[in-house]
């Protein structure tokens, strides 16, 4: 039944009218203004998914643009490949489309909500927890002449195990010298429903140990996979964003550089 439902949704998605970004001219050098224009919570405006809180609390977006621009500015005019994991309707993909004028963008999600199209955008249905879907993804990028990515951004489920599994799997598709980004990597510490593995060290601690080249015990990653990450990670930078909920800053972003 699930396969039939997916087949139906795929059919509907293919024939659904989409917004053609190739026909939209937006002149902006500011990634934050693009984030705000397309209303993604990566921007600074009050458009985050945390905005609609019952007590009327106003919550700003994450304000990640300043960090993205810091690390991505040298890639802005280059022909690069970008992979986004977890794109929903595609607001951030549309923003990156305008910011990276020559980039080819690959967007994956487990939902068929993506509403944009372009000659430079490739949407692919993929549930990253499904071995079958990951195999299809592997074949898909293989058919695209063995695509590897200059930038990979994980803004997916934010579930603890998924964050680590995505890092372990998709890091292999990152080019030498590329950047792997994890948005909201501390969410499992802030929201208990995202913490699906009991007694595991936090993502924050995982990143710290990877940065220090220290092997650690994990219920998710094998020692060989941890060694592989340590061997290939050059440096890690982490930052706090602007999203405050109930007096707590819940915005965290990590930039992981792969060795050349």
Task: Label every PLM stretch briefly.
Residues 1-153, 157-181, 186-260:
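A short alpha-helical cap/connector motif
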